[in-house]
């Protein structure tokens, strides 16, 4: 296998001298490869792909996912849905729409979808994930205000213990209630298997399957159809065939990947399409240098496998560790025994963030590198369209 420095240099080119740092640079070739591979996997296993846009937050990237065959898009918040409606009219809000402000914006989104449907002659589809009767009641009222049905996906807790109905009986009861309400359209079940890692045992996958199957069997015995059974997470995405009850997956990170995904074994360094370029602004000691990328650029998320390994991978210097972050400073250290090359003040280095989703949300824009674009050194600056959409 190529070293980190060799792998990095395969198709990335030097940046112009005046390129601003710190900044996020995304390689279009790597993005295309990542998107194509996931879509091919889904096609081969007859799974609908509904990618989560929380990673890239980009209308341009979302449109490419749809063009390659994605069924629709997943978002977390209504604000993201407002932006991503420019890329697809089939949207799933995988987050309970609780709160007056959020429900008002959902109502506005539904009205806009209705107006667009009237002008285009085709209906848009909006669904929301819930795990409580209280959430369902509020969304039902919102739907009645608009006079349009809202799709509902009931969230099951399959073991990650974040959101989701834990009890199968309660899940069946909630689904049955939703299926009888005017203003609501029961679309199916959703879950997030965040506790299942790539090396999970057959038993873990069986438990994941059984947690869903019990609810599905009971609903069908009551005459309630379950059209969609949706799972998620990039680490489990290409193992989803091990849970044959699924017919849809919602991975997000796969478009860019990050250092967490590399450590989990679901991506290689060459699959990491988004990297931060930073400038060395100080070399206070032989084994330490300071970057202009701090927590406001890289985020303070630690590594999911090795929390003490630092705040991202310095690709140019694999032995170095981003040991500490201030808002505008990234402190990088070498081991005491390190005898290799070191950067100088003014040099630029590349960092693969631990958690790319948070890193993207910290940027106003990113630079897309397209090898076949001769203008501006192949770089195009694009807005992070859904940045900061927290409502």
Enumerate the language-model features and the residues they cover.
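C-terminal accessory subdomain/extension
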Residues: 287-391
């Amino acid at each position: 296998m190529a070293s980190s420095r060799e792998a990095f240099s395969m198709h990335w080119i030097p940046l112009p001298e005046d390129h601003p740092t710190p900044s996020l640079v995304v390689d279009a070739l790597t993005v295309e490869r990542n998107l194509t591979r996931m879509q091919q996997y889904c096609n081969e296993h007859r799974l609908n792909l509904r990618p989560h846009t929380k990673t890239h937050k980009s209308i341009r990237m979302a449109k490419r996912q749809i063009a390659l065959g994605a069924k629709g898009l997943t978002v977390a918040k209504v604000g993201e849905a407002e932006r991503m409606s420019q890329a697809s009219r089939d949207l799933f809000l995988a987050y309970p729409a609780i709160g007056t402000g959020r429900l008002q914006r959902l109502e506005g989104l539904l009205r806009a979808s209705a107006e667009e449907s009237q002008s285009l002659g085709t209906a848009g589809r909006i669904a929301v994930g819930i795990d409580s009767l209280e959430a369902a009641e509020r969304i039902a009222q919102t739907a009645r205000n608009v006079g349009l049905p809202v799709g509902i996906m009931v969230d099951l807790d399959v073991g990650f213990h974040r959101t989701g109905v834990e009890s199968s009986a309660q899940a069946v009861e909630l689904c049955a209630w939703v299926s009888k309400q005017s203003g609501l359209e029961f679309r199916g079940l959703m879950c997030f298997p965040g506790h299942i890692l790539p090396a999970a045992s057959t038993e873990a996958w069986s438990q994941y399957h059984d947690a869903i199957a019990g609810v599905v069997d009971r609903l069908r015995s009551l005459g309630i159809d379950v059209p969609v059974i949706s799972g998620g997470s990039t680490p489990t995405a290409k193992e989803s065939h091990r849970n044959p009850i699924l017919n849809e997956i919602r991975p997000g990170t796969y478009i860019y990947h990050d250092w967490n995904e590399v450590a989990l074994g679901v991506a290689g360094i060459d699959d990491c399409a988004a990297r931060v370029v930073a400038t060395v602004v100080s070399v206070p000691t032989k084994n330490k240098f300071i970057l202009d990328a701090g927590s406001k650029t890289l985020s303070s998320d630690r590594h999911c496998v090795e929390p003490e390994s630092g705040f991202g991978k310095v690709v140019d210097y694999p032995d170095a560790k981003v040991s500490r972050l201030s808002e505008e400073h990234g402190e990088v250290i070498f081991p005491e025994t390190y005898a290799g090359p070191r950067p100088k003040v003014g040099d630029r280095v590349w960092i693969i963030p631990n958690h790319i989703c948070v890193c993207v949300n910290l940027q106003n824009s990113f630079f897309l590198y397209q090898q076949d674009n001769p203008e501006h050194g192949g770089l195009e600056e694009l807005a992070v369209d859904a940045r900061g959409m927290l409502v």
